[in-house]
C-alpha cells in the first residue's frame, strides 16, 4: 500500500505542477494577445504618422512652388509710389499732339489702373495626392 500511496502523492504533485503550468500558459496567452493588439495599434499609428509626414511634404512643396512664383518680381514691384511717379514723368516728357496723344492718354489710364495693383503670388490649388480616388 505504501507504493500506491507514494504513486498517488507523486501523481498529485504532477497534477499540481500541470495546473500551475496551465495557469501560467493561460496568463502568457492573455499577455501575448494584449501585446498583439498593442502592436497592431502601433502599426496603425505608424501609418497615420507616415500619412501626416507625406501631407507635410506636400505642403512644403506647395509653399516652395508658390515662393518660386514670387521670384519673378523685384522688390520695387511692391512699391506703388514709384510706379505713379514714373508715369507722371513719362507723361510730362512726352509732347505728342493730335490722335497719338489721345491714344496714349487712353493707354496711360489703362496702364495706371493695372499698375496700381500690387503683384500677387500665383494662386495655390489643392490637389488630392493619395490614390484613394
Curated annotation (Swiss-Prot):
Main location: nucleus
Keyword Nucleus carried by entry: yes
Coiled-coil segments on the chain, per record: 1-51
Gene Ontology BP annotations: attachment of spindle microtubules to kinetochore; cell division; mitotic sister chromatid biorientation; positive regulation of attachment of spindle microtubules to kinetochore; positive regulation of microtubule polymerization; protein transport along microtubule to mitotic spindle pole body
Subcellular location: Nucleus; Cytoplasm, Cytoskeleton, Spindle; Chromosome, Centromere, Kinetochore; Chromosome
Composition-biased stretches (Acidic residues): 106-117
UniProt keywords, alphabetically: Acetylation, Cell cycle, Cell division, Centromere, Chromosome, Chromosome partition, Coiled coil, Cytoplasm, Cytoskeleton, Kinetochore, Microtubule, Mitosis, Nucleus
Modified residues (N-acetylmethionine): 1
GO cellular component term of the entry, any: cytoplasm
Physiological role: Component of the DASH complex that connects microtubules with kinetochores and couples microtubule depolymerisation to chromosome movement; it is involved in retrieving kinetochores to the spindle poles before their re-orientation on the spindle in early mitosis and allows microtubule depolymerization to pull chromosomes apart and resist detachment during anaphase.
Family named by the database record: Belongs to the DASH complex DAD2 family.
Further comment: Present with 279 molecules/cell in log phase SD medium.
Subunit text: Component of the DASH complex consisting of ASK1, DAD1, DAD2, DAD3, DAD4, DAM1, DUO1, HSK3, SPC19 and SPC34, with a stoichiometry of one copy of each subunit per complex. Multiple DASH complexes oligomerize to form a ring that encircles spindle microtubules and organizes the rod-like NDC80 complexes of the outer kinetochore. DASH complex oligomerization strengthens microtubule attachments. On cytoplasmic microtubules, DASH complexes appear to form patches instead of rings.
PANTHER family, sorted: DASH COMPLEX SUBUNIT DAD2 (PTHR28036:SF1)
Protein name: DASH complex subunit DAD2
The encoding gene: DAD2
Amino acid at each position: 500500500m505504501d507504493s500506491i500511496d507514494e504513486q498517488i502523492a507523486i501523481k498529485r504533485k504532477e497534477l499540481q505542477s500541470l495546473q500551475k503550468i496551465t495557469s501560467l500558459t493561460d496568463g502568457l496567452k492573455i499577455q501575448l494577445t494584449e501585446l498583439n493588439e498593442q502592436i497592431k495599434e502601433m502599426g496603425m499609428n505608424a501609418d497615420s504618422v507616415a500619412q501626416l509626414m507625406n501631407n507635410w511634404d506636400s505642403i512644403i512643396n506647395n509653399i516652395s512652388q508658390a515662393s518660386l512664383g514670387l521670384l519673378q518680381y523685384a522688390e520695387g514691384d511692391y512699391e506703388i509710389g514709384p510706379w505713379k511717379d514714373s508715369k507722371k514723368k513719362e507723361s510730362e516728357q512726352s509732347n505728342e499732339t493730335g490722335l497719338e496723344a489721345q491714344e496714349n492718354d487712353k493707354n496711360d489710364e489703362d496702364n495706371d489702373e493695372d499698375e496700381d495693383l500690387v503683384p500677387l503670388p500665383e494662386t495655390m490649388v489643392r490637389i488630392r495626392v493619395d490614390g484613394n480616388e
